[in-house]
Amino acid sequence: MTEMRHGRSRLLRRPIAAFTAVIMALGVSYLGISPANAANANDFNAGNIISDELFYDGYAMSAAQVQDFLNQRVPRCTIGDPGRTAGMTWGNTSIANQCLRNYSMNTVSKAANPYCGAYVGRANETAAEIITKVAQACGISQRVLLITLEKEQSLVTDSWPTVRQIDVATGYACPDSGPNWSANCNPEYYGFQNQVYYAAWQFKVYKAFPSSYGYKPFQTNTIQYNPNPACGTSQVYIENWATAALYIYTPYRPNQAALNAQWGVGDSCSSYGNRNFFMLYSSWFGSPTLAAGTPTGEVKELWTVNNGIRLWGWALDPDSITSPVQIHVRFGTSWAAATADQPNSSAETLYPGSGPNHGFGMWITAPPGPQQVCVW
């Protein structure tokens, strides 16, 4: 829950930031896809960091989608490269055996409780499976858990994490009570499954007992800028449960210097946890403050073919879940449109009662050479 966790903190590193796919037409090579827009820290709204709709969506991603996302963030794990041998001492910890993209562990079962459903453990469960199962059990978005892993320990993008990073993966039970407001983590909650589970569990507890915590939704709160009280406070009207949960978990508001710095370093009173949550979510998944009823969907796959590209996915309007919506695709100076009215079960899984026909598929002519494709 603190701002920095380990000696190689990379929380200020800029991730990929465009809701585009860059491709080579004529079937050459697909260079990459990132499912989000460019982030701007000055769009940060202290009272509404993320909407409840997005935060409490336990079915935002499947395990396969989480795994694909981890693979995109770290195309190659560099543990084992010269100077990065697994088990090698690094500061007061050691280099881990695995990156998050290929991490696995034997998980334990956890009984259902008022905040999370039952979790059935098994041998050799991957990080993607753990993230997905915890999200579904506790009703916290897989995207939120991925962002938490990144803002706390840079685990999503680190190609050679340390044991310490994995032990305190989400910063759960790590209050800023150490020397100079450093993290003071409780070893009882070490371990990847523990950290992911208890972070999600804690987010639900915050909502169940709002009067038990210092920051409350739907009222004005006094929030520090930094763990150092001398840096002062500000008044923030917290607009929803999700934003309150983020402030309870990481109890600081970024100051103007932190926001002006975008992904960089502000001043001695800057804090970055909630700024980075907003920036990472915006960069990776689009706006975190999606209003209820905003059309939503997903490009499931995009690939090159001779003379063009193909893509498919699903989309719907939560205000009218049985009605088809229009999809628009722009590439270069050209654009195309389609109606999301084809068979696809993804929408109905996330929005029961919406029906099976919210899919779309498109073939688009494109000239040779690199193309930037935007879908909305």
What does each model-identified segment do?
Residues 1-12:
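N-terminal secretory signal peptides that target proteins for export/translocation
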Residues 16, 25-35:
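C-terminal segment of classical bacterial N-terminal signal peptides
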Residues 38-129:
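N-terminal export signals and maturation junctions of secreted/periplasmic proteins
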Residues 39-80, 173-292:
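Non-catalytic cell-wall polysaccharide-engagement segments
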Residues 59, 120-128, 137-142, 162-165, ...:
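Solvent-exposed, acidic/flexible segments
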Residues 113-118, 155-190:
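Substrate-binding clefts and substrate-entry loops adjacent to catalytic sites
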Residues 132-156, 199:
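Short, functionally critical alpha-helical segments immediately adjacent to catalytic or ligand/cofactor-binding
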Residues 292-376:
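Long, low-complexity serine/threonine/glycine- and acidic-rich segments characteristic of extracellular
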